[in-house]
Amino acid sequence: MAGRENDSPIAAAEPLVDLTAASTGAAAAEVPPELLAQSLGQYLRAWLQRIRSGDSGVLPVLLGIIVVAIAFQIANGKFLSPQNLVNLFEQSTIYMLLAMAEIFALLLGEIDLSVGLVMGLGAVLVAEMIQPGGLGLPWWVAIILTLLLCSFVGLVQGSMVARLKMPSFIVTLGGLLILEGVCIIVLGGSLVGIGNSHYNNEVVIYDLFYGKFSPLVSWILLAVVVVGGAGWVWFRDSQRRRSGLVAPPASLTLLKILVATAAGVIVVAVCNVNRAHFGTIVGLPYLIPIVLVVMVGWTMLLQRTRFGRYVYAIGGNPEAARRAGISLPKIRTWGFVLASLTAGIAGVLFASWQVSITTNVIKDANQYVLLAVAAAVIGGTSLFGGRGKTLHGVLGGLVIGSIYNGLFLLGVPAEWIDVVVALVLLAAGTIDVLSRRGAQPRA
């Protein structure tokens, strides 16, 4: 039976544990030593030891964001202003979502070159569906249908990769070209606008990107998230300790809660500063909870479910995963479906951001394909499969957004900005290769 692919989604727990422990580069390969620590001091020592061994996690990208922010603030005193910081996050949202979409493919050791045009398709579909002179669908129906159709694109591409054994590069490159043509055909050379003053459905879509909570609601949302999140994390870790399972020290759990709370307070405080030169613009953008929900949802899926363990196992060692009874075609197909679904979410926000959708906007979506891969890799996701988190996509998207934003403030031409982003990508790719090489056991 080991020589035959098993389509059953059910596999024994023990073989999967052995599999992931043996898979080189799999994110869930071993229990990190710091998780076995009994105190905060032991945790920090084990964490530093892991960094010295070459497994630095998100530390490089966090340090990179800090360095970039300081450098641009010194070069241009406006970079860290509340107005620019909120603008920076809004500009980075598309990069973040597309990077999270790409991560599903990269974790499986594949690549999806179509996510940018799936985003374009999502933008065209949702804009066309809500037009009063067209289908005139309610905004929520338009969004659901858009996400379903985008997911169908992933289903087709994933099936071709998983069932027909076609290279994902070829399949998704073909998908990119087909989707570009489909978007242009659907638009028919016309402009599709999304206003914010007359038609209710258009206003809702418009507000997804440009809408903001009031300052009071922003603080209430933060309080709900902090109390709910902190309570869940504390309860989860406490339950694991009482059950004799691996869990971080209570002091570390408390420290994480305090750090997350402080970060949330800073974000809401910055957003509640008046950012308008004339009039008033305050409040938390709707975009922040949208990205947060997507990131947390996909993190839970990848880190806390059997499906997520299977994804990491396949990316780390496909043959061992197959022998453990994992259905490779099914998991790979679902990986591409989720990538396209996430790109569809980005497409809805892209339509809101652009306000009007034209063929030129769709052609511009091509550049987001490579930026999605760049954001995922810069954030810390491996190009070789089996290692990465959705958080890496958010951080990588923030890095790319910071570079574009900072260099734009300095008046650097667009072509040179692309050169800088490419150099950062090459550096991240080099680090990925070297870290993998260092992690391989010596003969």
Residue ranges of model-derived segments:
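Short cytoplasmic-facing helical segments at TM-TM junctions of multi-pass membrane proteins
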Residues: 307-332
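Single transmembrane alpha-helix segments in multi-pass membrane proteins
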Residues: 70-133, 159-169, 184, 320, ...
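Cytosolic-side transmembrane-helix boundaries in multi-pass membrane proteins
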Residues: 2-64, 68, 191, 228-264, ...
